[in-house]
């Protein structure tokens, strides 16, 4: 069992290594500890910490650095969120002070704001889609058998795609199909709309068009675009600033992790109904990708009441100042949730 002094030494080694990136020796610790401890005593305590695997020696220095086990122990037992300085608080609050026109705009911009504040890679996910409803659907003729399909949702999002209409579908049939959508699907949650496309809607469309498959494909494609979980990334290139890899192909692979939605969702371990009210930290050897062994991933959920929950994540070096980042993420999720709740309230007022 570690003594209070050994725990204090471990915390100081992590703090000093985080600040300087240099191995920490007994002389440096002697000048930084809040009580007088001899260099010999510190060396003995460091030897004990090394024996249990919490710190380790580097080849190029007589000092010690935290091990992955040491970081995990620190994160599980010793860390306290840092009290943010007023400038950090003001910067976050001012960043959300501008007017936004869409939910997506707020969530995507928040990734850029957080990345700029931290110099790390930031990832944000909008509130869950379960309560978002279909509020509008239109087909705008573009000529040459092309139409633009437009879907509007209760989240304030507008999604559109251009499609080529099969020759077998007439303009009159399209108008009737749009009427079916407006009569039977408007106002329903997107998840319910998706289900009805496979069950009730085909039979309804068969009353008005000989082959509804073409129209169903159009509507289904643009609905999927509106329904997909949106992950936004800020500061993609920051990820490469902390890599110890020199192989170009491996560096490209790291960069691709955050540019491929499936890889990113897997990294974040997104799963329905799972929510973290506290900031969670995963270290490199705890992640699914070996290329990230020198990185640390911090995630936390934010709550937007009846509109669901979203997620904020930070991906940076294992040696990032976790205490400050936890404090910053706690503040950031509060401000993001406030902004989204205000947006939803304004949107509801405008709809009534």
Curated annotation (Swiss-Prot):
Keywords from the named record: Repressor, Stress response, Transcription, Transcription regulation
Family membership: Belongs to the HrcA family.
GO BP terms in the entry: negative regulation of DNA-templated transcription
Coiled-coil ranges from the UniProt annotation: none
SUPFAM superfamilies linked to this entry: GAF domain-like (SSF55781), Winged helix' DNA-binding domain (SSF46785)
InterPro entries attached to this UniProt entry: GAF-like_dom_sf, HrcA, HrcA_C, WH-like_DNA-bd_sf, WH_DNA-bd_sf, WHTH_HrcA_DNA-bd, WHTH_transcript_rep_HrcA_IDD
A GO molecular function held by the record: DNA binding
Entry protein name: Heat-inducible transcription repressor HrcA
Function: Negative regulator of class I heat shock genes (grpE-dnaK-dnaJ and groELS operons). Prevents heat-shock induction of these operons.
Superkingdom of the source species: Bacteria
């Amino acid at each position: 069992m570690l003594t209070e002094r050994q725990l204090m030494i471990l915390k100081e080694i992590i703090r000093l290594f985080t600040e300087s990136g240099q191995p920490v020796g007994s002389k440096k610790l002697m000048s930084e500890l809040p009580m007088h401890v001899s260099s010999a005593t510190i060396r003995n305590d460091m030897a004990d910490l090394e024996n249990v695997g919490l710190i380790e020696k580097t080849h190029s220095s007589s000092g010690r650095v935290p091990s992955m086990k040491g970081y995990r122990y620190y994160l599980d037992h010793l860390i306290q969120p840092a009290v943010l300085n007023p400038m950090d608080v003001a910067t976050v609050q001012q960043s959300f002070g501008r007017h936004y026109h869409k939910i997506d705009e707020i969530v995507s911009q928040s990734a850029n704001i957080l990345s700029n504040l931290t110099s790390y890679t930031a990832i944000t996910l909008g509130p869950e889609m379960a309560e978002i409803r279909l509020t509008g659907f239109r087909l705008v003729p573009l000529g040459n058998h092309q139409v633009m399909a437009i879907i509007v949702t209760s989240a304030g999002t507008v999604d559109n795609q251009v499609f080529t209409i099969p020759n077998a579908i007439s303009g009159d049939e399209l108008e009737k199909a749009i009427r079916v959508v407006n009569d039977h699907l408007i106002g329903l949650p997107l998840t319910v709309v998706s289900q009805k496309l496979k069950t009730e809607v085909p039979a309804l469309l068969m009353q008005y068009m000989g082959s509804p498959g073409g129209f169903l494909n159009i509507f289904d494609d643009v609905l999927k675009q509106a329904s997909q979980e949106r992950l936004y990334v800020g500061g993609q290139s920051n990820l490469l600033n902390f890599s110890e890899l020199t192989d170009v192909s491996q560096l490209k692979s790291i960069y691709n992790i955050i540019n491929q939605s499936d890889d990113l969702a897997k990294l974040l371990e997104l799963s329905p109904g799972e929510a973290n009210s506290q900031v969670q930290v995963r270290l490199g050897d705890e992640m699914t990708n070996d290329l990230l062994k020198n990185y640390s991933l911090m995630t936390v959920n934010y709550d937007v009441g009846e509109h669901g929950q979203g997620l904020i994540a930070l991906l940076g070096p294992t040696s990032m100042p976790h205490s400050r980042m936890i404090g910053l993420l706690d503040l950031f999720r509060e401000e993001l949730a406030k902004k989204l709740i205000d947006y939803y309230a304004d949107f509801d007022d405008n709809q009534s």
